[in-house]
Amino acid sequence: MPVRVHVVDDDAFFRTAMERRLTQAGYEVATYLSAQNLLDRLPSESMPGCVLLDVRMPGLNGPELQERLSKLGSTLPIIFITGYPDIPTTVRAIRAGAEDVLTKPVSADELLPAIERAIARHETTLARKNKLDLFRSLIKTLTPRERQVFELVIRGKTNKQTANALGGTERTIKAHRVRVMEKLQPRSLAELVSLAERVGLLGDASVSQPTV
């Protein structure tokens, strides 16, 4: 799968040099002359990627762009590159979720491993998101009765409790549970509960571990 590195820096020479270096390393590269330029061309997250971001720029600076992207729900990992390193800036950036903070001039031995780590992190994030998107779509395939059973199963109800709540037999409820598991494709009941919680179906409810 192709990956894209987004380079944000007001220094045209740096952008050109970085684009050349990263292209030679096999990455797709998009360059931006300012933080606002990136916001105006907000990157798609349909492919794995990361952002190489200068700390000091006219207008929005790097940390301010980091905050904006976070509020927009972006999951692109950020690697800061700065010619003026200082400990407070580095600490704030890392605490806010930056992958790394590198100092200009940055060597390939520092840059490429940092990018590889960021890309791996984003690939994991996208895989989790895709799994949740699939889970949401599979829930829509449940029949009304299966959805009722599903709602009780993820709250830890036994077959007997579910049958009492819905007015059916344990045998019928067990059959519905089997179909729910087949349709939603979790590896276990524990994963079913975890997925349901991550897509917001449990709210703040306290859920016990479901029994088989």
Task: Give residue ranges: language-model regions.
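Active-site residues of response regulator receiver
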Residues: 54, 82
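Basic, Lys/Arg-enriched C-terminal extension of HTH/homeodomain DNA-binding domains
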Residues: 181-212
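Recognition helix of helix-turn-helix DNA-binding domains
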Residues: 158-191
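Receiver (REC) domain active-site loop signature in two-component systems and cognate sites
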Residues: 57
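C-terminal output helix
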Residues: 86-88, 102, 106-115, 161, ...
